Amino acid sequence: MKDLQGRDINYMRISITDRCNLRCKYCMPDGIELLPMSEILTFEEILRVCEQAVGFGITRFKITGGEPLVRRGCADLIRKIKKLSGVEQVTMTTNGILLSRYLDELLDAGLDAVNISLDTLNRGRFEEITGFDQLPEVLRSIDAAVDSGLRVKVNVVLQQDKNAEEWQKILEFAERRSIDVRFIEMMPIGRGRECTGVSNDELLKKIQEQHPGVCKDDRVHGNGPAVYYHIPGFVGSVGFISAIHGVFCS
């Protein structure tokens, strides 16, 4: 499959639910008007879509939500997608709250990698941002996923006057563990318009000042638009998804 620019497309994101067990300030703090279950694709329908997509050259799938793990049977869906001829990789984006509970099932199903959202290491601030006191569970999930050998990326959204100063502590996740820490610029859509994000250009300059020798990491880390850097002495890498200041289509 090719896009209008002639680029090969081999990657599809599938949102399996609009439900979420958090209420992040910049996302859906008051909840959203949920779709009736009758209007949400069944797993059988999703699998048929995947079968057709593979026929057009899609080989990699990412399972998202909402929070995908609040929908029963998520691991079984992953198992069935992985069994499709031609599928090379199935990954998932999660807030991590339920990940440790279902990790063994997901590994058995063949999950290849996981992206975990984490904006702060401060327990009180986590509850302020997400609406729930669940930071310890998220950290347990990250540790469990890393220990299992699963490839892990930690997604971070920084906000001025909220968690901007925490970038150093969060970056340390990549120092001794094989984790990609990815800083994602705040998108000014929905409730995100009320928040002030942090420029990735400014953040990169701060990292370069603190860690001389930072260089581009040209290894393939996934299918998305992130630009990665290697910090001398770090096991993992740091990535930037510059939704505001980046140019994705040049």
Regions found by a protein language model. Name each.
Residues 4-43, 56:
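Canonical Radical SAM [4Fe-4S] cluster-binding loop centered on the CxxxCxxC motif
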